[in-house]
Amino acid sequence: MAPSEPSSRPTSTGGNRIPYFDLAKGVCILLVIWFHLGVHTPFDPYLNAVRMPLYVFLSGLFFKTYGGILQLIRKKTKRLLIPFFFFYLTTSVLLPILAHNLLGINFETGQDWRLLYAFLTYHDFPNIPLWFLWGLFMLNVAFYALQRFIKSDILLGLSCLVLGIVLGNLLSLPASISKAFGYFFYFYLGYMATRYDVIERLRVRKVLPVSLALFVLAGFFCPTSGVLLYIQQTLLSVAGVLTLLLLCKAIKRLPYVSYVGRYSIMLLVTHEPLIRLLDVAHIGNPYVSFLLLAASYLAIIPFMRRYMPHVTAQK
């Protein structure tokens, strides 16, 4: 298979949109919210194996060099860092401080000005899902550097794999570095999937039964060895991501899920504060909370599109 031309890479912002990518992103962000609500099911090992790898894989699908490192940093600053810093300052710094001083509400992660730099340490902060935007920025810059100097696809993949193992598993680094680089290999797989047009070329009827069977079977094994466990988890995640993408390719579009997938960054940056608000309202049923959150975005997304486009990567 020959690699696709750079101009054929899908976009998350404009006219070259591929509908089932929005569907996949919608499934992904809804799984994230489901997880943060603390909902537990017998399928948790499978869902947990797919949730974050899928998000990073999709990010790799959309990777572009933009003609140089400065252009890449400028683009990713607009799409990742500006939303990160805006919502970090408002929901992880100002909100906890004001809630503490005005309402007497305390946050487990703190409520003073030390929250300004909490994301650079090992500590948690109130709107913890924001780490993903910061982490994606690091992964994009790191991947640009690697693919700029490593021309072999195999060596590039091995480099991402080794960096992911060392930085993400063997070391414990602050500023969400370990957390982000633990998924670096899936970023590479997403990039390669678009480079060689893998998802488009695969036939759903032929490949889906195989990937689904592999996904289910991989979840039955629980090795105790660290190396075998890493291989098993990687195989489980890759099979799960492929299965979900092929399902989305077959379905193409589900109105609500595809809609929130297109604006998934808005759900990412706001769902944790909304969950805390529901906690204050003492809604004890996570399924009810999930439905309330899902319904609220029918109003939140249009509001943010109109009044907050620059801080939600819409401009």
Q: Which residues does each PLM region occupy?
A:
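Alpha-helical transmembrane segments and their immediate juxtamembrane cytosolic regions
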Residues: 1-315
